Amino acid sequence: VARLSLNQATIKRATVAEAVEGCVRHGIESIGLWREPVADHGLERTAKLVADAGLRVSSLCRGGFLTAVDNRAALDDNRRAIEEAAALRTDTLVMVVGGVAGDKDLVGARQRVADAIAELSVEAKSAGVTLALEPMHPVFCADRGVLSTLAQALDIAEKHESVGVVVDALHVWWDPDLDAQIVRAGERIASYQVCDWLTPVPADVLLGRGYPGDGDIDLGRLTRHVAATGYAGDVEVEIFNADIWAADFDEVIAEVSRRYHAIVEPAL
């Protein structure tokens, strides 16, 4: 499990301490953290806890939400997120860029994202942090992510040394141009996240993620394409699913490890 990372959202009800302890028990060497539970535990305490446990922090989630016409408060929050990522000794801040603002101006929202990333990239570079733009499935364009394809994320990322992209299986698997865009991304792939797309889709599509192997995504093929770029970073398992959230943390972590070994690791 050297490259397996447990994204904290997979065991959403767990505290930071419980998530770290679970990783250690199951021999998982890396964890993807979220800002809210980190704040609950305390930033410095979390950094020490993770370091003392010998874990890497594969990413911090999340910055972003930059699409408001007046996004000054969001920019300030993202500056704090960059500082938090540096304090946690991760070089990857996942950016969920935000949905369409109230004016329904999708073109304008995308431009505001590009402008904000240009501004934040300077501070990210100085902190040694990569802003990892996460393209999101088009179903989330209205409320979460106006960048729907890897190509759109790369159009912004390629302009800045400190900006990369996230390849999240759930968000990109459907894209007919995906293979070419993964090749294009190359060393700009800052994070690789896996889960599966469940059908039928639940009423809250956000919670439609399953364990690798339970859905419709060819994760072996996708993983081989990502690995072919030379990506050698951690592979996060990130699952939003009400039943998995309600389950015992230890059972979930054990199942994550089993699925990673069976489905993802052989393709790396």
Label each PLM-derived region with a short phrase.
Residues 1-27, 51-53, 83-84, 89-90, ...:
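Histidine-acidic metal/acid-base catalytic patches
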Residues 98-110, 137-144, 209-210:
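Surface-exposed cleft-lining segments at the edges of enzyme active sites
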Residues 126-160:
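Basic- and aromatic-lined ligand-binding clefts that recognize polyanionic substrates
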Residues 23, 58-61, 141, 195:
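Generic recognition of cysteine residues
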Residues 10-12, 35-37, 63-66, 97-101, ...:
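Active-site-proximal loop/turn and secondary-structure-junction residues that shape catalytic pockets
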Residues 29, 33-115, 121, 125-126, ...:
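Structural motif corresponding to the early beta-alpha repeats
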